[in-house]
Design a protein with these regions (language model features):
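Bacterial N-terminal signal peptides that target proteins for export
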Residues: 2-11
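Sec-dependent N-terminal signal peptides
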Residues: 10-18
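N-terminal signal peptide c-region/cleavage motif recognized by signal peptidases
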Residues: 20-22
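Disulfide-bonded cysteine motifs in exported proteins
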Residues: 24-25, 222
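N-terminal Sec/ER secretory leader and immediately downstream segment
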Residues: 25-131
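Heptad-repeat coiled-coil alpha-helices
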Residues: 98, 105, 112, 141, ...
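Extended amphipathic alpha-helical interaction segments
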Residues: 119-213
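A cross-kingdom marker for long, charged
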Residues: 195-245
Length: 245
């Protein structure tokens, strides 16, 4: 029995952690953003460690309510910083969403093949996928006219995301065991149902591992690229603040 439960835990962990991976990948970086960012067509507003900065698309700067007189170099710094924020934050959000959906689709195919199209595990993974996307939207909140990045939400979202995965795991494990048991019972094959179920679990686990191997490099590259962009944005922020004095 202990051996069976360890195998089930391994299967469930593989399924769920693969799904959750890219929701967290973009935030696993030594550099932590220090500001909220509000992007609209009129300006990029940065609030937090930077005080309150508003940068226009042309590089004009309002700092803590005061319009600053800028040198050409300062204006170019501000222009480049707000341009990078407008480009990189949507890119991060889109990339994370795409990879989360890609993992869901890939896992769904594995579940259909191994457990059948009527498996309730499919519903559980779809629900988990939607919940993780909702968590991500707490960090990068999209609006019709732009987006808002909430830097203080990062740690809480990581915590809540892990809890969602853990809460879903029990149901996935139970459904997998029940459905494989029913499959074995209806097939009428073999005299050792437990051994047959364990064999099926092994096949499911291997299929998931193969899918993870296919996607792992892309997920890791995305995480590294996000960290690089976040690091560059933080350097630009510090350099601009130093220049403004």
């Amino acid at each position: 029995m202990l051996h069976k439960m360890k195998a089930l835990r391994t299967v469930g962990l593989a399924i769920l952690m693969l799904t959750a991976w890219q929701a967290q990948a973009e935030y696993q970086c030594s550099v932590k953003p220090q500001d909220d960012v509000n992007i609209s067509p009129q300006s990029v507003q940065i609030v937090g460690a930077s005080g309150n900065l508003q940068i226009s698309p042309d590089g004009d700067v309002i700092r803590n309510g005061k319009t600053l007189t800028l040198t050409d170099e300062q204006r170019q710094q501000a222009f480049r910083y707000q341009t990078a924020l407008r480009k990189d934050l949507p890119w991060i959000d889109q990339g994370a969403q795409q990879r989360l959906e890609k993992a869901r689709v890939s896992l769904d195919k594995v579940i259909v093949k191994e457990l059948g199209s009527n498996s309730n595990v499919r519903n559980r993974l779809t629900t988990l996928n939607d919940q993780l996307k909702q968590q991500m939207s707490r960090i990068i909140e999209k609006r019709s006219d732009g987006l808002t990045f909430h830097h203080q939400a990062i740690d809480q979202v990581e915590k809540d995301g892990r809890q969602l995965v853990q809460q879903s795991m029990g149901g996935v494990l139970q459904d997998s065991l029940n459905e494989m048991g029913v499959k074995q019972a209806t097939s009428g094959a073999g005299n050792n149902p437990l051994q047959a179920i364990m064999g099926n679990l092994g096949g499911l686990q291997q299929a998931i591992q193969n899918e993870w191997n296919n996607q792992e490099q892309d997920f890791q590259q995305f995480g590294h690229e996000v960290c690089s962009r976040v690091t560059t944005l933080e350097q630009q922020r510090k350099e601009l603040l130093k220049s403004l004095g």
